[in-house]
Amino acid sequence: MMYLCDLYNNVPVIKVNEVKAIGCGAKNLYEIEEASYVAISAGTGTACVACNDNVFSHLGGISVGGGTLLGLSNLITNINSADKLDKMALEGNRKNLDALIGEVVNDIGSLYPDITASNFVKSVDNTSHSNEDILASLSNMIGEVIGTISYLNALLMNVDKVYFVGRVTLLESVKKGIDKRLSLANISGIYKENREFGNALGAIAYAKENN
């Protein structure tokens, strides 16, 4: 395991805990004034951070994120460019691969017919699909997973919105999946320009405030 040294070219290195960097990054980027909020760092994986009166805590995380998306995309379609992947996903139709609730059982409670019942299930009977459709389904699935863990933690903390940092939500195909899943719990996803730098900005801000 590699560790960051305490000195670099005789300059002291200030180390900031990632949880604090995520929470502080969201607070500064979005100029959050609420005493309690939830920040979601959606990057290679996904981490959820809560803030209560400037105390940051790690709610949990999952290994599914942008790394998963690019890895599976490369394995299945030989495409490992995020921009190309996103463009193709937006051109595809995930309904050619995914089964929707309306196709299976109609409405279930508050779940409307267009919600996914099973990702990729239609490939069981038909393996001939375009890369665009595959990437549309894959991007949506990653978005649904991120959206689900986001709204569950929002409900846990009794907030009605989550603030995103990290690069994955720059991919519109993933962001659409996140927002559809958040809407199931009436949770709003908040996105701001430069959110891909949120963790780095948070580390800088936290270091300035505490040193």
Task: Give, region by region, the residue ranges found by the protein language model.
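Glycine-rich phosphate-binding loops at beta-strand->alpha-helix junctions
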Residues: 1-3, 152-155, 159-181, 195-196
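Glycine-rich phosphate-binding loop plus the immediately following alpha-helix
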Residues: 54-109
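Glycine-rich phosphate-binding/hydrolytic loop that grips phosphoryl groups
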Residues: 23-30, 69-73, 81, 183, ...
